[in-house]
């Protein structure tokens, strides 16, 4: 999406800017005290930095908060079509941090962003991670083979994203899909997602991420992440069941697990975006 096409009420539009690093033209929210400790926030598949709109105010009072749209999502664009997988995306995010001359005090990731946060903790000096309904599980059974194959096939077809945008992106349909996650977000939140999914480039980025996603090496490496990790799991999450975080916590040497009421988009429903809970853990 061209930033000039963003709705006037797009969250933190005025605090975001382009950052070109290698093949990626990032769109990055950068807010809070410039000399404060840095928090890097990573959204999930199909979302954008807007999804942290309720969390950012609570965090940015004390921290410099950096929120990029992931490659191919929102307003971030990449010409490297083979770098949408977990490890390449983590590598490119670290290059963005180096470009900004920051080392995050913690990385906070939602869903697939939680997996990327853990990959960063494994590969870089990132000292702490918060995962919100972190997507740390494979598709089960036959779906584990069929779904990635479908995504690879669809991502290779030039007409797939426009078709999804044209026939599957009505406000009503998107609202229904969001409700199926176990979270009912407000009308403004649904409108933001509608704007994204009505953009073929955003849909294409999501398909490429699905096609190139491989969790196996990270799952096997969880015992090597000897850093504090705070996993927040929504008991009503229908996209990534709470047991996924519970299972991962057993393999992380310094994990804290907290199960709370709510669905997959719990940080978009909670009045403070879960910032209070996260600050308590970061500063406790």
From Swiss-Prot:
Occurrences of domain AB hydrolase-1 (ranges): 37-269
EC number: 6.6.1.1
Domain of life: Bacteria
GO cellular component: membrane
Pathway field: Porphyrin-containing compound metabolism; bacteriochlorophyll biosynthesis (light-independent)
Transmembrane segments: none
UniProt cross-references to InterPro entries, sorted A to Z: AB_hydrolase_1, AB_hydrolase_fold, AB_hydrolase_sf, BchO
NCBIfam families xref list: bchO_mg_che_rel
Name under which the protein is recorded: Magnesium-chelatase 30 kDa subunit
Protein's organism: Rhodobacter capsulatus
Lineage, top ranks: Bacteria, Pseudomonadati, Pseudomonadota, Alphaproteobacteria, Rhodobacterales
């Amino acid at each position: 999406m061209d930033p000039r096409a963003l709705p006037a009420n797009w969250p933190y539009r005025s605090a975001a800017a382009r950052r070109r690093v290698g093949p990626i033209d990032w769109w990055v929210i950068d807010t809070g005290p410039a000399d404060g400790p840095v928090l890097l926030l990573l959204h999930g598949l199909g979302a954008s930095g807007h999804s942290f709109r309720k969390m950012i105010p609570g965090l940015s009072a004390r921290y410099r908060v950096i929120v990029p749209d992931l490659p191919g999502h929102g307003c971030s664009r990449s010409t490297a079509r083979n770098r949408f997988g977990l490890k390449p995306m983590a590598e490119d995010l670290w290059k963005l941090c180096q470009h900004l001359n920051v080392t995050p005090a913690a990385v906070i990731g939602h869903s697939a962003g939680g997996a990327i946060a853990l990959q960063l903790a494994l590969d870089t000096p990132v000292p702490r991670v918060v995962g919100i309904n972190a997507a740390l599980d494979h598709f089960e059974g036959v779906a584990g083979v069929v779904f990635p194959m479908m995504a690879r096939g669809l991502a290779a077809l030039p007409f797939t994203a426009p078709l999804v945008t044209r026939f599957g992106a009505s406000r009503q349909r998107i609202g229904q899909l969001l409700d199926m996650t176990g979270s009912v977000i407000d009308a403004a939140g649904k409108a933001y997602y509608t704007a994204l999914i009505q953009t073929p480039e955003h849909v294409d980025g999501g398909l490429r991420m699905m096609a190139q996603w491989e969790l196996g090496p990270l799952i096997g490496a969880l015992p090597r992440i000897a850093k504090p990790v705070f996993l927040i799991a929504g008991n009503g999450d229908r996209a990534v069941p709470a047991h996924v975080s519970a299972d991962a916590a057993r393999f992380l040497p310094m994990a804290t697990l907290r199960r709370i009421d709510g669905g997959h988009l719990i940080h978009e429903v909670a009045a403070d975006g879960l910032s209070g809970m996260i600050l308590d853990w970061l500063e406790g």
